[in-house]
Amino acid sequence: MLTPAQQHFNRVMAERRHASREPSQLEMTAYETMLHRLRLDKARLSRVQSQKAKADLKRELLPDYQPWIEGVLTADSGQSDDVLTTVMIWCCDCGNIAEALRIGQYVLRHKLPMPDQYRRTTATVLVEEICDPVLAAFKANPAVAPVAADLLEALRGLTLNEDMPDEVRSKLLKALGYTLRLTDNVESLTAAVEYLRQAAVLNPKKAGVTRDIELLQRALKKSEIGRAHV
C-alpha cells in the first residue's frame, strides 16, 4: 500500500508527464517505475489459476495505481499510457464498471491504443469484458441483474459510434434487454424488447433471444390489457 506521500508523488508525476511535450527524466522514470510495478503484478496474477482469485487480487492491487490514473485524467493530454489502459481492463474484471467507463471514455476520446496483448479495439474490449460476465451471470440466475441498467446504457452510448463486430454489439444489446426486462416499468420492458430485437438482427444465429422476446411481448400485452381495465 502506498503512503500518502507516494500517492501524491505518483499523481503529480503522471500529470506532469502527460502535460509536457518533452517529459523530464524524473517524469519518465516515474512512468517506467509504474510499468515495472505493472509487470510484477502481472507476474503475480499469472501464477493464480482461479478467475475469482485473480479478480480479488486485482481489486487489492488497484488502489496503488489510482493516483497515477487521476494524474493522467487530469492532464487530459491523450498520450498513450499502458498503465491507464490496463487498469481500465482490470476494473472491468473486478466489476468496477463505473471506473472502467470513466477511463474508457478518455481512452476512446483520445483513440489510445490498447496494450500489445490485446488484438481488439478499445470499444470491443470494453463491451466484451463487461458484457460476457453479465450474460454468464444471467445464464446462472436470470432473475438478478449483475450490472445496473444505467451503466450498460452508458456503455452503449460510449460505444455507439465505434466500430466493432456485430456479434459483440449484439452481446451489449442482449445484456441491456435482459437487465431491463427485470423491471415492472412498461417503458423499460418496451425498451428491453427493442434491444433484444436489435441483438437478434445483429447475430441471428447465436443471439438466442427469440423466446425471450415472445415472453416479453406477452407480458406487455397483459400489462396493456390490465391498464385498459383500470
Residue ranges and their predicted role:
Residues M1-D81, E99, Q105-D163, V193-R197, ...:
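N-terminal alpha-helical interaction modules that lie
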Residues G78, T121, D166-K171, E187:
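Residue signature of alpha-solenoid helical repeat architecture, marking inter-repeat boundaries
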Residues T85-T86, E129-D132, K171, A175-L182, ...:
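"A position-specific structural signal for the A-helix of alpha-solenoid helical repeats
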Residues V186, T190-H229:
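Extended, charged low-complexity segments
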